Amino acid sequence: MKKMKFVVVMAAFAASLGITSCLDTSSSGGTGTLTWPFKVSSDYMTGKTIFVDEADNEYIPTTAVTVSGDRSDLAMVSFSYDYEQFATQGDRKDITVLGTPEYLPKGEVSGEVIPEEGTVSLSGFNTQSLLIWGYNDYLILNPLFYVHESTVSETLDTELKNHKFTLYYDAATKAENDVMKLKLRYQILNVGTEDALADYTKSYSYCYVYFDLRSAIRAYP
């Protein structure tokens, strides 16, 4: 019962962040699928890639996997599992990875104030588009923004590199009433003039970006 609750909680978080899930939590067992952000690690015995969740549970792929993209701390992983087995395996759980896991891009955390000038507003952003991973370890965002109207699938990766997300705090001030304020800034790089922003008309929401909150917390006075 305790393990079932753990899976259901993961599904609830997944729904809030727009992550897909399909869980069979019936008492007779069954299978389920889930897409979830994990920390990427390696098995101390085999050296193979494994995944770790917020509670330090380890997820062991049944076959060797390679994570695509630029290496970072977190990856988005789609997997299936046997429910009865999953519920009894303790803190090391067997999973069947579906597709190729992808590293999440890491956003910059800055101690310098970033003025609003030169930044762009985000569309459709709310608290349901974010997730605190672990005990204030990482902040994961799923923002909606606009890419250039000429963007096609072949040029998407290049276009996305021009969209920069920065989380900043004012290192020169102390927390007010013991509350640390973090602010998000969104910039589109390599735009010649402000008028050129009118050409950014294609909405894009299939992007996840994470920030390492630990660095900000450690540095804050």
Locations of the language-model features?
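Bacterial Sec-dependent N-terminal signal peptides
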Residues: M1-F6, M10-S42
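First exposed extracellular module after export/assembly in secreted or surface-exposed proteins
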Residues: G32-P221
